[in-house]
């Protein structure tokens, strides 16, 4: 092979250096453009990015927190019809198979739409929620029909015009065959009892 000597060698070396510098600037500009085009997601969109098939909530408390955040979004956030449907499907994934069998998705979704309309028509807004402590949840575990179950209390803060009230619900969760905690049912707690 012949070597380039003299002017030809210098010109080729200069071309390679310029191509390398150009490629470097091309890549660095591209990275800056990608960083600038990050999209600000809404609370609903961030929630819908969760893939429960790959990363299911690990504890009863986390299941109720996710369900409650979805519920808060139903009554307090802006979303499209498609996002509403996707949130409903996500909350339905948290249901135990027995609850899902007694309340098919179409019935659940129709009831949810009515509830949302009622809350919006009457200007109710869910502003916050808190759940039982992990220790209380651990102490509430019990066995039923061969399943491990537990109770989780959730306290919802609701605003109606200038009034603020707290609603307490008790959730019963059951560990399924895959080891996932699923919502078996829930009920309002009568504060007078």
Where do the language-model regions lie?
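Short beta-strand edge/turn micro-motifs at domain boundaries
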Residues: 2, 30-42, 163-193
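Core segments of small alpha/beta cavity-forming domains
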Residues: 43-123
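Surface-exposed, charged secondary-structure patches
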Residues: 112-160
């Amino acid at each position: 092979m012949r070597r380039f000597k003299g002017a030809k060698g210098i010109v080729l070396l200069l071309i390679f250096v310029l191509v390398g510098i150009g490629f470097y600037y091309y890549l660095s500009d591209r990275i800056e453009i990608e960083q600038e085009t990050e999209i600000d997601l809404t609370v609903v969109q961030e929630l819908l990015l969760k893939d429960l098939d790959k990363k299911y909530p690990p504890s009863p408390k986390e299941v109720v927190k996710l369900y409650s955040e979805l519920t808060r979004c139903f009554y307090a956030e802006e979303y499209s019809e498609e996002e509403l449907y996707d949130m409903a499907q996500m909350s339905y994934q948290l249901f135990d198979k027995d609850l899902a069998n007694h309340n098919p998705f179409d019935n659940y979704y129709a009831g949810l739409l009515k509830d949302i309309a009622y809350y919006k028509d009457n200007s109710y807004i869910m502003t916050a929620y808190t759940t039982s402590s992990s220790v209380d949840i651990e102490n509430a575990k019990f066995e039923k029909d061969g399943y491990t179950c537990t109770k989780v209390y959730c306290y919802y803060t609701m605003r109606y015009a200038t009034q603020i009230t707290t609603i307490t619900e008790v959730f019963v969760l059951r560990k399924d065959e895959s080891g996932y905690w699923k919502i078996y049912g829930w009920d309002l707690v009568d504060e007078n009892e």
